[in-house]
């Protein structure tokens, strides 16, 4: 990586000049009703789209006033508590929720089995991808590692640039399939090169769920308990709401 110290003096001068020449009067934000970040000045989330894919209720009306409340999370009109209760005891809560968010309805048994089979088929990375992309440039910032991996995967995608729905669904399924591998392998590379830990690359098992494969690939002995897998499965389900609508 470039030696930033070599240009530190000049960069400091450039920074001061940039700040001086690009200052914005704070009163203009209120004058033109410009949102700063994802919330307005009253703390309300900024409306960025109109969908029923997901919704978060963080406020309620009391005496004509909006006040914070115990949050409610909805996926396609389903309260997430109801989803978790309905999927309790099943191995594929995350997969069922992914089907719901992508396709708009809860899957039946056959549909869920078909969807999880698709995920298993796509849970593979290009030849030497782990070595050449993940291991050769490990990062302490896992989001940086994931971003780089996804951008590089685009070079292996024959459907890149296509906008038809089928191609985009295929791309979504492929990304859902490989993200656990990208995350775990990226962590192991960082742990080995930056922290002096051990390196081990475990392959995913097509018969296991996403949560189970995450734990299998993460652990040195590939072992985990049913409780750990269940808790992680629910955690993955809850974290699916991140800018989805």
Protein language model features and the residues they cover:
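Hydrophobic alpha-helical bundle cores within soluble ligand-binding/oligomerization subdomains
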Residues: 1-245
